[in-house]
From Swiss-Prot:
The modification Phosphoserine is found at residues 85, 96. It holds the Pfam family zf-C2H2. Residues 103-115 have a biased composition (Basic and acidic residues). Its main location: nucleus. GO terms for molecular function: transcription cis-regulatory region binding; zinc ion binding. This is Zinc finger protein 513. It is found in: Nucleus. Gene3D superfamilies: Classic Zinc Finger. Residues 44-55 have a biased composition (Acidic residues). Transcriptional regulator that plays a role in retinal development and maintenance. InterPro entries: Zinc_finger/UBP_domain, Znf_C2H2_sf, Znf_C2H2_type. Residues 1-118, 492-541 are annotated as: Disordered. GO terms for biological process: retina development in camera-type eye.
Length: 541
């Protein structure tokens, strides 16, 4: 067979081996196995002259090759009208320069140059603007299959997502893989750990649009916003209880409709698991609920006349937090700065003689709040429980915030600075009290005389003059006084230090260790000896 010559012989790369067409090009070009990476989307031209001897008289031919994988060389690929194979088959046809290759039909999006959308999970076709396979379409057709529901076998939890069910199952197994790096806190969900870390960083990203309230949890913000929106629920016909959030109210029982309440025995009284110290006459400060008042009178009994309200512990009536010196400028309704700002923004608060529209009220004092955790924290002022203790001194408090503020006494940190003078302190309440020196404001006024002052401690000390109480007694002589400063000054007469001992000073928040129990008077509310004595004995930390 005569050899075929080319005017411009070119080397063709075959299976990674370079073959010269002039020496070894014995077969037609269709028998070559060309590399796919060389021929992707490319056309190879073979320019041939007329053969000298007999042969085919074709001049120029254009041959096209489509991209094919290594393992799919036999048979036709789906979507292509012709097969790709080296074997002759009756179903194929010869390709020439004049023949046109039929292209598969394109969608309307591909004709405009757009990429096809995701495939339908039911029929596998491309999804468009409308339903792809007629399922659930406006023109009828079979309805879409229902979405899968993943349900818990241990409770009524149901979800559309399996990941939610796996996360929920950790609540039953007790697994808590997410742990805090600063404290022993652990949780089964990452979102809870993220919310917990804000307690260490102090971040409060959720802010109320109606008042300066800010918090670190979206749930707390939604609960707070219920104080701005919506009227309170109707009061209870028996005790006047109200709720801030609309809740289904229990229909009154037949005995309540008749106006008679069943009398319970003393053994059936439901009391909180707290060691309550109820002063004589304390029942006069209970809310106007007959049931609570009856229980309070059974606890308190009958005694002397009630003491003035100012002798009660200075706690915020909005959140239950114990107030420091300089806080609570409103007499009879002492409030912390955050609750006062909330009240200025339109939050209604209950009066000192009843819970008002607040759902959780203390049965031993006029304290009322919207939140049950605030009431539980407030009850520690009555029980005398102080779980938070300082590691460097005997100081203890019922609130963690007070302990953090006290620790600045040991560290010497003073983050609060006066903008008008070089004064700096470690307590925001002290800075506010110092600011009254520049402004001359005296918000604390006596209700029995014209006395006014700029510190709540001075007003408490002044009220002892009206009651005649002198709680500070000398253990050496019969000297008594109502002022802690006078008591320390008197101890110098006996050669003792400022706290009653040689060279010692009283730590803040506790009585001198050598003083007998008679040093402090036991008259008045027990809460005065537990919480109010700290304000009478020494300045706040």
């Amino acid at each position: 067979m005569p050899r075929r010559k080319q005017s411009h012989p070119q080397p063709v790369k075959c299976e990674g081996v370079k073959v010269d067409t002039e020496d070894s090009f014995d077969e037609g070009p269709g028998a070559l196995v060309l590399e796919s990476d060389l021929l992707l989307g490319q056309d190879l031209e073979f320019e041939e002259e007329e053969e000298e001897d007999e042969g085919d008289g074709h001049n120029d031919q254009l041959m096209g090759f489509e991209r094919d994988s290594e393992g799919d060389s036999q048979g036709a690929r789906p979507g292509l009208p012709y097969g790709l194979s080296d074997d002759e088959s009756g179903g194929g046809r010869a390709l020439s320069a004049e023949s046109e290759v039929e292209e598969p039909a394109r969608g309307p999006g591909e004709a405009r140059g757009e990429r096809p959308g995701p495939a339908c999970q039911l029929c596998g076709g491309p999804t468009g603007e409308g339903p792809c396979c007629g399922a659930g379409g406006p023109g009828g057709g079979p309805p879409l299959p229902p979405r899968l529901l993943y349900s818990c076998r241990l409770c009524a939890f149901v979800s559309h997502y399996s990941s939610h069910l796996k996360r929920h199952m950790q609540t039953h197994s007790g697994e808590k893989p997410f742990r805090c790096g600063r404290c022993p806190y652990a949780s089964a969900q990452l979102v809870n750990l993220t919310r917990h870390t804000r307690t260490h960083t102090g971040e409060k990203p959720y802010r109320c649009p109606h008042c300066p309230f800010a918090c670190s949890s979206l749930g707390n913000l939604r609960r707070h916003q219920r104080t701005h929106t919506g009227p309170p629920t109707p009061p209870c016909p028996t005790c006047g209880f109200r709720c801030c959030a609309p809740r289904p109210t229990r229909p009154p029982s037949p005995t309540e409709q008749e106006g008679t309440m069943p009398r319970r025995s003393e053994d059936a009284l439901i009391l909180p698991d707290l060691s309550l110290h109820v002063p004589p006459g304390g029942a006069s400060f209970l809310p106007d609920c007959g049931q609570l008042r009856g229980e309070g009178e059974s606890l308190c009994g009958t005694g002397s006349e009630p003491l003035p309200e100012l002798l009660f512990p200075w706690t915020c009536r909005g959140c239950g937090q114990e107030l420091e010196e300089g806080e609570g400028s409103r007499l009879g309704a002492a409030m912390c700065g955050r609750c006062m700002r909330g009240e200025a923004g339109g939050v209604a608060t209950g009066g000192p003689q009843g819970p008002g529209d607040k759902g959780f009220a203390c049965s031993l004092c006029p304290f009322a709040t919207h939140y049950p955790n605030h009431l539980a924290r407030h009850m520690k002022t009555h029980s005398g429980e102080k779980p938070f203790r300082c590691a460097r001194c005997p100081y203890a408090s019922a609130h963690l915030d007070n302990l953090k503020r006290h620790q600045r006494v040991h560290t010497g940190e003073k983050p609060y600075k006066c903008p008008l003078c070089p004064y700096a302190c470690g307590n925001l309440a002290n800075l506010k009290r110092h600011g009254r020196i520049h402004s001359g404001d005296k918000p604390f006024r006596c209700s029995l005389c014209n006395y006014s002052c700029n510190q709540s401690m001075n007003l408490k000390r002044h009220m002892l003059r009206h009651t005649g109480e002198k709680p500070f007694r000398c253990a050496t002589c019969a000297y008594t006084t109502g002022h802690w400063d006078n008591y320390k000054r008197h101890q110098k007469v006996h050669g003792h230090g400022g706290a009653g001992g040689p060279g010692l000073s009283a730590p803040e928040g506790w009585a001198p260790p050598h003083s007998p129990p008679s040093v402090l008077s036991t008259r008045g509310p027990a809460a005065l000896g537990a919480t109010g004595s700290r304000a009478l004995h020494s300045d706040s930390p």
